[in-house]
Swiss-Prot record:
Species of origin: Pyrococcus abyssi (strain GE5 / Orsay)
Record's cofactor remark: Binds 2 magnesium ions per tetramer.
EC number, as in UniProt: 6.1.1.20
Protein name: Phenylalanine--tRNA ligase alpha subunit
Binding site for L-phenylalanine: T343, Q382, I383, D384, F423, F448
Amino acid sequence: MTLGYNEKLVLLTIAKLEKASVEEIVKETRLDQVAVMRAILTLEKEGLIKLHERKEKIIVLTDIGKEYSKIGLPEIRALRVLREKKKAYLDELKDVLREDELKAIVGILRREGLANVRKDEKGLVLEITEKGEKLGERPIDIALKLLSEKGEVSVDEISRIIDVKDLKRRKIAREDERVERTVEITEKGKKLVSKGIELKREVTRLTPELIASGKWREVELKPFNIKAPVKRIYPGKKQPYRVFLDKIRRRLIEMGFIEMTVDSLIETQFWNFDALFQPQNHPAREWTDTYQLKYPEKGYLPDESLVSRVKEAHERGLAGSRGWGYVWSPERAMLLMPRAHATALSARQLAKGIEIPGKYFTIQRVFRPDVLDRTHLIEFNQIDGFVAGEDLTFRHLLGILKRFAIEIAGAKKVKFFPDYYPFTEPSVQLSAYHPELGWVEFGGAGVFREEMTEALGIKVPVIAWGIGIDRLAMFKLGIDDIRYLFSYDLRWLREAKLIW
């Protein structure tokens, strides 16, 4: 074992005193308390000394108590005036009492029998009593004086003078905790001391002067302990979930996807439902499954030719379909709502025009009524995308989804389940296995129906998906509660591992 100068000095001091407090060691060695404690912890780790800690409850003055120790308690100051005047109106005490003290002084003087209180046409009159005239030193005065002199007093000692609750009730003092530390040398420490310890000051820094003069040969250079525990540093870093989103965005762009962007969180029902061939009487459009805007209530529809094609698809059908067979309402389509799924952006992009073949994606905030728990939020992020091309099939879609789950989320097991969406056929649900939560649904996907794509001006197959990217992040970041992604928990934010 290698001991430094401070450790040797502290060990020799403890050996001389056999048992000592930290304060005694500081006084004996003339080292500061931090250096002494550091040396004590090192010596204890080596088994050369034993450190004993005893916790004790203490009472210390508050800022108010410190003020009272200098200028006197409110009742003492009030009595000085009353002894001089015998009686005084409450307002006459304003020179010696603060506003908050004036409100309390009447009760204190009356409760302790120090003054009689009555009211006349001018206000409250305080008249000193015989007890007030002869008042001597009370327990509270003795306690205040003792605390002022010592700084801190044990609860046991102060309790012999006054009930601690009385001091705390008047906010004169508060309870704290003091740790008394004593150390004693062990047999191992005694053996080391008996062998002889050379106390030689160490040099912690090899300077150019020491090298040039050759004195480095004469001094003892303190070795660096690279295994010594140090204070953990928490450098600034990006929020873990933001890093995850940025990585996914970058990877998709590297794979040739084009990002779809939008400035607003609000959509008309036209883009959120109607353009996706979802009928206006569908239960998913009701308040139980979506949010609606109270004001403004309605937005604007796009150009008439697009609206008429969507109307035709709903009422009579397109691409050989019979449609939904009802009278489509433009008024219903104009209703505004927070976006319920990012697929609304896919519909906008298809109507705007796309490259064929082409790959598109977006990461957007969406809103749906739900019960908050560790896998569900009412406001969450969704990654939505589609691929358009002449020869695309459902199997291409399954391959993309599996790649998402395994490569991006880090899932080990993936399952596909048949599903239903009004705007895709066939449709599929993607689920992955989480070690803590079991099978977790990631999202839905399918081949856009021709009634939808033809109304939007697209003549080739389009495979599409909408995945809860928050759940992908749960897998990648190794968490079992989706709410942590948006948490202010400093411990998690500091300790979350960097990904990729």
